């Protein structure tokens, strides 16, 4: 029997506000343990939360970017549970009336087709702290993350394969990043994914028993975990067994999902309205103000790169996959850089350098200005493409002007015949055996002189000019 896969995803995204959702403490990632905390984060008696307006701004932008309806009458709810990283013993979240609902996003699949994935809801909430279990028998609580603003985006169960889930996450990450509300860095926990997956016989409308997958710390692991679950559940069902409602984690080392716990039923969090935060209304004017702050999104930007700049669909997709790269490209082209040349450098040498160094574009010294200048001095013959690779590495590590560096480092290409011809004659004098081979008509003997000349000029001879002059001088040599 063949089965249809049904997948829904829950994605937590940390919003990039300066302070937390209900306290003025910094929401910055990477500080020392418990450095970003105050009495509200520790839930001292008598403290009251104060809503950060910037969080609601970000929530509105997310809802608009994901084609969602917006609940204009806003309130928060208490989600009650006890855990050491949650000192209040409840989380302030949204239950029955999330900020956004009934949305969708269009995703592009590997075969080039597109599919619209529904989004059930997006709600605002506070993050919990972090527990660390030490080898000394103690557990430690870091509340830096406690109160960091989150938006949880819950998809409809519209995905029918791990490939579609991967495509959905890719598209969602792009939209959130372009909207400017999160850096969506999974390695820093600012984007976290839980997956729900079930199988059912083709033609059956009722969903099968679902499994929840956790510990999915990359899009690749989401895909691998789901692929494993499809196989695991199908084998159980084909053998006559039943799927239990479980929470499982993906074990990257074993490339398998591991049981965490069996779910007996839905958790009862005893939601009720948060009494310490008043109701408020999101006005049409507020919504429109946030709409005006939204940028051009990846789909529209890709289309413009193809139609206006003449890039291929592939190049446009690669450039727009990351907003930082796309914005860099935009600025370089605005400065007069040739779109195709800038694209080639960003996807070629720049990407290779970043991968080798383990860095991002923001972490190196290359700027749109010095990249455009470097491309210009390649075009005008000041440097060769080969020398440009060395110049690029210097710019990436040290910054500064491309032309200034080339001149100071003595890398300017030699194009003057008055300089090159004497060097060619010296090459002939230094390589008598090669000259003899050439004069005797030995096949491909002339090719050796190209290498000799480039070595003599330390690679600085303009290849086009040098080859033309070399051919001219070789012809004279043959006549003598």
From Swiss-Prot:
Its EC number is 6.3.5.-. The keyword Transit peptide does not apply. Keywords: ATP-binding, Ligase, Nucleotide-binding, Protein biosynthesis. Signal peptide: none annotated. The keyword Ligase applies. GO terms for biological process: glutaminyl-tRNAGln biosynthesis via transamidation; translation. It is an enzyme of class 6 (ligase). Gene3D superfamilies: 1.10.10.410, GatB domain, N-terminal subdomain. InterPro entries: Asn/Gln-tRNA_amidoTrfase_suB/E (IPR017959), Asn/Gln-tRNA_Trfase_suB/E_cat (IPR006075), Asn/Gln_amidotransferase (IPR018027), Asn/Gln_tRNA_amidoTrase-B-like (IPR003789), GatB (IPR004413), GatB_C_1 (IPR042114), GatB_Yqey_C_2 (IPR023168), Gln-tRNA_amidoTrfase_suB_CS (IPR017958). Coiled coil: none annotated. It catalyses: L-glutamyl-tRNA(Gln) + L-glutamine + ATP + H2O = L-glutaminyl-tRNA(Gln) + L-glutamate + ADP + phosphate + H(+); L-aspartyl-tRNA(Asn) + L-glutamine + ATP + H2O = L-asparaginyl-tRNA(Asn) + L-glutamate + ADP + phosphate + 2 H(+). One of its GO terms (molecular function) is glutaminyl-tRNA synthase (glutamine-hydrolyzing) activity. Heterotrimer of A, B and C subunits. Allows the formation of correctly charged Asn-tRNA(Asn) or Gln-tRNA(Gln) through the transamidation of misacylated Asp-tRNA(Asn) or Glu-tRNA(Gln) in organisms which lack either or both of asparaginyl-tRNA or glutaminyl-tRNA synthetases. The reaction takes place in the presence of glutamine and ATP through an activated phospho-Asp-tRNA(Asn) or phospho-Glu-tRNA(Gln). PANTHER family: GLUTAMYL-TRNA GLN AMIDOTRANSFERASE SUBUNIT B MITOCHONDRIAL AND PROKARYOTIC PET112-RELATED, GLUTAMYL-TRNA(GLN) AMIDOTRANSFERASE SUBUNIT B, MITOCHONDRIAL. Belongs to the GatB/GatE family. GatB subfamily. This is Aspartyl/glutamyl-tRNA(Asn/Gln) amidotransferase subunit B.
